[in-house]
Amino acid sequence: MQVLVGLLALALLGAGPAAPAEPPVVRVKLTTQAGVIVLAIDVKRAPATARNFLAYVDDGRLDGTRFYRASRRKGAPQLGFVQGGIDTDARRRLEPVALEPTSKTGLRHVDGAVSMARYEGVNTGTANFSLMVGASPNMDARPGSPGYAVFGRVVGGMDVVKRILAMPTNPGGDGAMKGQLMTRPVTILSAQRLDGTPHPTGRAKVWLLFRR
């Protein structure tokens, strides 16, 4: 019996301290060519989407990506959203995250909201995200539409977001992006978490080996 107790004690000592829990809100600093934007990522209310985004941040997968879309509202061009992230760069992509609808999280597409972009399929979000300028309730979940996942808010640099929204766009493009692709995309020089402990995935950083 004493031997078993001793072995158990050694096992507990060898296990070391438990990993610290993620803070309920994690701030992320985006340093861009247009200035600094600070996001507050809501780990508590949108845990899957938040952890997915933070994985990209902790891996450095957002460093060198761009804000490439400025979607201005017709009749009120000072409102809309900007979109950025990995775009179609498959070298940076991790597995898609399941949609956490606003009807589940209680988060809404209010002014400054951070929203996960996706393809037509519901569970197709990766690391393209939108920053709201003004409220966009049409992007919330509603009967007949799953909407998009809100997972944070802008807490610093909203003036930078508005400046990006006002930048020139090309008249071309297809579908919803027609006329919204920026003439000169704004590079995200770095994305850095300001709270909690980074949890890199350990995956190969292929985009660093074969730069475009």
Regions found by a protein language model. Give the residues of each.
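Bacterial N-terminal signal peptides
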Residues: 3-14
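Cyclophilin-like peptidyl-prolyl cis-trans isomerases
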Residues: 15-212
